[in-house]
Amino acid sequence: VAVLCLATGCGTTGGAGAATATGTPFLPVYVDESAAPDRPITLGFAGDVHFAGRTAALLNDPSTAFGDLQDALSDPDVTVVNLKSAITKGGTPVRTEGNFRAPATAFAALEEAGVDAVSIASDHVLDFGPQGLTDTVAAATKAGFPVFGAGQDEGAAFRPWVTEAQGVTVAVVALNTTPLFAESFAAAADRPGVASPADTKRAIAAVIDAKRSADVVVVYTQWGETDAQCPSPAQKRLATALAEAGADVIVGTGAPHTLQGAGWLGSAYVAYSLGDLVWFKDSPVSPDTGVLRLTVNGGAVTDASFTPARVSTATGQAEPLAGRAAETALTRFAALRECAGLSAEPPGASPSPAPAPAPASGQPG
């Protein structure tokens, strides 16, 4: 057992009120220091999924809803995406427009595609009020499909999804740090809602709680600024704080609706935004998307690859790219790393030669 200092007074030279380099106050907490199993596992991540508008018809046949990207989604030991629709037939719309819901067959489509769990930390899960959230969780339970990031109270919303792969325990924490449609959408002790941390300390606490019992901790967060291809200063500050708290992987989605840079931030791996995966309208920035595949060994990401894809203007599905189109997309993705301030290699690694071109996947740089 080790002491991890994240608020005042933990034997720091600064004494009371000392803080980390990011300004996060120190708080003494006890975490399990036992080494993660020296056994490689693979984790897969992709972005936002909406079964609305042009993508609603995809659920007519759930087995084909994710098209040719199914192999990339099903290959990793664990795959997670972001569901942006309430699964409900009831409730009352809360917005004048832009209320999104889908039938329960969405869970069948996700399962058929090889997705293992989804974050529902989007405020769209409350587009039809608390009833929409209750129905979403009930439908997921009936389907036997894991959802996380929202619930009947704050404890349920911040509770990580925990799974095991090859004997390695993985905890995935969902957060939403974007401005919510209504303040009441944030889960509280006596109110249903999404995992919307009031401050950085609450986000850090969620990571620490997960770290107590998991070999690998992933934070899957909605954040950022609309249509931005570079992460905001707020994203960078939060990523650093989460990494300092013990997050091994930090994956973003949500507001950007486009790819942002990915790479190592110290020993943690950060993908600031994976954009849209199955989407109801065209992006004004770029249709680029894809599936991120990470190899984790001993609790640290040792390798990363990316299957580039493009959201179809006809169906809204992400279609994997091949040949020259894939090479060009990978080059664009790698270029986004510069403004993200991330490294193309894990700490201590020797610079590697440029990867050989891949028809549908390869290292993002």
What are these regions, as identified by a protein language model?
Residues 1-2:
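N-terminal export and membrane-targeting signals
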